[in-house]
């Protein structure tokens, strides 16, 4: 243990008497090889720690280099854009530093304003579509109400015409009585006319027969004195029939 501590700290060895012989340290180290193993372990330990630190630092350096390259490209792009803007301004006219200071802000706000304009346009289109749909619904409701009114009027007219036709097909009892009375009167008149015609024809025929028969008798037999009442009766009959 004394040898191990002597590697890290300097320990004053105890005084050696003059009579004692000094042992050989190389022989003891060869006999007990713990010094070499500890030294090798410490050596490899420091080597491994150094390698790990190197790799960690190398990764950090690489990431920083990439960031620097990206920032360099962005700065180069910015410089190029500025140069182009300067060129355009120099072509257009005099250069104004206030305009160059304001332009980056305007460039940053342009996409926001464009999106806002798009949103406002979309909102207005939605409102227009809603109003158009409401207007169409109102027109449709008015058209439906007009059609229902027309349909109700047509149905009422049809119902009234149907009632009139029913009243015509199904007359009232008063009209039936009137029709029967008129028909009876017509029948009586036609019967009376037919009877009158028949009596007149009979009278004419009898008159003709009597006249013809009397002429035949007159031609066959001359008239006698005693026959005067018969002739007078025949003449009376003829006069009566002629009057009738």
From Swiss-Prot:
Ranges of compositional bias, category Polar residues: 97-112, 132-142, 231-244
UniProt subcellular location: Membrane
Domain of life: Eukaryota
Region (Disordered): 65-112, 132-191, 213-244
Pfam family, one: DUF4636
GO cellular component, one term: membrane
Spans traversing the lipid bilayer: 35-55
Compositional bias per record (Basic and acidic residues), positions renumbered to this chain: 80-94, 161-176
InterPro entries attached to this UniProt entry: DUF4636 (IPR027955)
Membrane topology qualifier: Single-pass membrane protein
The entry's keywords: Membrane, Transmembrane, Transmembrane helix
Protein name: Serine-rich single-pass membrane protein 1
Organism, scientific name: Macaca fascicularis
Encoding gene per record: SSMEM1
